[in-house]
Design a protein with these regions (language model features):
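Primarily interfacial, aromatic-capped hydrophobic alpha-helices that serve as membrane anchors
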Residues: 61-68, 462, 468-486
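Conserved PDZ fold ligand-binding element
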Residues: 201-223, 284-306, 464
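Internal alpha-helical transmembrane segments
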Residues: 9-13, 20, 31, 38, ...
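Small-residue-rich helix-interface/hinge motifs
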Residues: 3-137, 430-452
Length: 489
């Protein structure tokens, strides 16, 4: 059930993003008088689940039917000497078609829902794209086609999708900020008890109980942003307060690589172990532990904090151990049977207070812009790490499983929209990369045309697009292959 909930959230988020992205291309095309032949959610190879189109002023709807026949006849030609085949395309006389034949309505758009849930597309007349419509491109250019428009108009059409994804992220962040404000765990709050570190943090030179003073001389207000700060800014040192004095902890040269390979955060906040929940039927309930109890000892070992308890309790797997518990003014010693898993069935209560910043609607507007462009900048930095082999960031590339895993186990509307905004930014940044087959590839060739006043040939664009799609397919296979490999680790 958890997997299904995650999948549904992923599909819903991607559907919203694809529709918004393609709508950006669609509306820009219509503004400049370029016809849009098809607007589809998901891909419709061979047939579609649903489609509709306005023909002669009337809307027609079709369900689970094959795609419409082409508007061109393919004629095969064989060279009498070389025996090589070539093809020419002859337009069908649309006037001879039945009145309700969708091909007659060239000036309207066919909207539909495909059956392959890998995105969607907007088929713009006269444009070399993933459809590779050679029949259309072999005809004389028409005034309503993409290829006949000035370079600046084609440029706006191509960036329309990316622009709409950025706008969507801004609007979502404005809405979330205005309605919910911003909640975060401040570094100052964490410093009340100090941090706890795992083996990686310990290897860096950090210790349990350290209090974060600065990162490369900069104070980080939001505690949970510290790990990403270390990765994106290639931090040299962390200043901590330890035993009443400030200590500089210098990070090793391979810190970024190790952080990227690490599956969990190398630092966490530290809290006293006060039981917040006792799971029914587990060892803790059977032993008589209750909500509000504070565990201060496991056997003879002092466990003032939850991280101390976790380190000690695993030493007693499949054994009985005495826990010293504070219950109100009383100190109680309770024997508890520890199962093989090392988990006795309790959860710690959150005793730290999250900071909340409230925003009015008007204050939320500039905050929405700031947050969006900050996220864009951070994602660019992450991409630079991926293309730098020394960081090993390429090893962490993930596909649909990795994306789906970031959604919560149950639907939480705030978290859903927050992740949708983040994915919208990722889609915008990825699409603007100068790779043929992506919007950025088209933009690259258009900028070349503007600068040189020479338009790349259709043949060159077709080959470049094919190469780009092969590269993207390899990248897709690699990313999703990484996901599958991680499942079996």
């Amino acid at each position: 059930m958890v997997v299904l909930i995650k999948v549904l959230q992923l599909v819903l988020a991607l559907s919203i993003l694809v529709i918004i992205h393609e709508f950006g291309h669609f509306i820009a095309s219509r503004i400049f008088g370029v016809r849009v032949e098809k607007f589809y959610m998901f891909f419709d190879t061979k047939f579609s689940i649903f489609r509709c189109k306005k023909v002669n002023g009337k809307w027609y709807f079709k369900f689970f039917q094959k795609n419409e026949p082409e508007k061109y006849r393919t004629i095969e030609n064989i060279d009498p000497i070389t025996k090589k085949k070539s093809y020419t395309y002859e337009p069908i006389d649309l006037a001879t078609l039945p009145e309700d034949d969708w091909r007659r309505a060239e000036d309207t758009t066919e909207f539909g829902l495909g059956w392959i849930p890998l995105g969607g597309y907007c088929k713009i007349a006269g444009m070399i794209d993933e459809s590779m419509d050679q029949a259309q491109m072999a005809q004389e250019p028409k005034p309503w086609e993409f290829r006949t428009k000035p370079a600046w108009q084609r440029l706006i059409i191509m960036v329309g999708g990316v622009f709409m994804n950025v706008v969507l992220a801004i609007l979502i962040y404005i809405g979330l900020t205005a309605s919910c404000g911003e909640q975060y765990l401040s570094t100052a709050e964490v410093n009340k008890n100090g941090i706890t570190v795992d083996s990686l943090g310990y290897s860096f030179g950090l210790r349990d109980g350290d209090k974060i003073v600065s990162v490369d001389g900069k104070y980080i207000e939001n505690f949970h942003k510290i790990p990403m700060e270390l990765i994106l800014e290639k931090t040299q040192y962390i200043e901590v307060e330890r035993d009443g004095r400030v200590v500089k902890v210098y990070l090793p040269d391979d810190a970024v690589r190790n952080l990227l390979k690490h599956q969990t955060s190398f630092i966490d906040f530290r809290m006293p172990f006060i039981i917040g929940d006792v799971l029914e039927g587990e060892s803790a309930e059977k032993a008589g532990l209750a909500v509000g109890d504070r565990i201060i000892k496991v056997g003879d070992s002092l466990t003032l904090y939850f991280n101390d308890f976790r380190k000690q309790i695993v030493n007693y797997k499949s054994q009985e151990v005495s826990l010293t518990v504070l219950r109100g003014a009383d100190t109680i010693v309770m024997p508890v049977a520890v199962p093989e898993s090392g988990l006795i069935g309790v959860r710690n209560s959150m005793t730290l207070n999250f900071a909340t910043k409230e925003y009015s609607f008007w204050q939320a507007i500039p905050r929405g812009f700031t947050k969006t462009f900050t996220e864009i900048g951070d994602y660019w930095k992450q991409l630079k790490l991926i293309f730098n082999p020394s960081t090993g960031a390429y090893e962490s590339l993930g596909g649909f499983i990795a994306i789906g895993s970031i959604f919560p186990d149950s639907f939480q509307w705030q978290q859903f929209w927050r992740l949708t905004a983040l994915l919208s930014i990722i889609l915008a940044v990825m699409n603007i990369l100068p790779i043929p087959g992506l919007d950025g590839g088209h933009v690259l060739f258009l900028l070349y045309e503007v600068v040189t006043r020479r338009k790349p040939s259709d043949k060159f664009l077709e080959k470049a697009t094919t190469i780009g799609f092969i590269f993207l397919l390899i990248l897709l296979i690699y990313a999703n292959g990484n996901d599958i490999v991680k499942l079996f680790r």
